[in-house]
Regions:
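A generic structural signal for well-ordered coil/turn residues at beta-strand boundaries
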Residues: 28-29, 72
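Short, low-complexity, intrinsically disordered N-terminal peptides in bacterial proteins
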Residues: 41, 140-141
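Feature captures the catalytic cores and cofactor-binding loops of soluble hydro-lyases/lyases
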Residues: 53-131, 136-139
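Short beta->alpha transition motifs characteristic of CBS
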Residues: 48-52
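Intrinsically disordered, low-complexity regions enriched in acidic/Ser/Thr/Pro/Gln residues
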Residues: 1-28, 35-47
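Short beta-strand scaffold segments in enzyme catalytic cores
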Residues: 30-37, 121, 129
Length: 141
């Protein structure tokens, strides 16, 4: 299966910062991104902000369906917590890598382990916590 490198994760986090426009101006919104996973880099394919974190996820899921995008080589980023619902939605989209700047719930953790999603939380700048799927993550060390 696919692997995610620390360099690609850092590239994603750098690019997400450039996209959070409503959040920078007003706050109180969640952002979600669908990104490529290309070796040592990552490009954002789509970015959605909404007051409801589920709305932002669903907008990306819908766009993936309309554009017939395969999730197997993608990374999903959310500003929201890694809940069971977020993990299930990522699994339904076929995305193996789930990244958030927030934390996780116990149920989200358990489901991610069960379905084989690599889940990374508290991801900001050069800091992150790898919660599940460590075998598919390559750090720079």
């Amino acid at each position: 299966g696919a692997t995610l490198t620390q360099s690609a994760l850092y590239a994603l986090l750098d690019r997400v910062r450039l996209h959070e426009t409503i959040y920078k101006q007003a706050g109180a919104v969640h952002g979600c991104a669908l990104a490529t996973n290309e070796g040592d880099t990552s490009q954002i394919l789509m970015f959605v902000e909404d007051v409801g974190r589920h709305n932002a996820v669903d907008a990306i899921a819908g766009r993936m369906w309309l554009d017939r995008l395969d999730g197997a080589d993608k990374i999903f980023y959310t500003t929201g917590r890694l809940t069971s619902e977020m993990v299930i939605k990522a699994a339904q989209m076929g995305i193996p890598f789930l990244v958030s700047r927030s934390g996780l719930t116990q149920m989200g953790f358990e489901i991610a382990q069960k379905v084989g999603i690599t889940m990374i939380g508290r991801a900001t700048n050069k800091h992150y916590l790898l919660f599940t799927g460590g075998a598919r993550f390559r750090s720079a060390i």
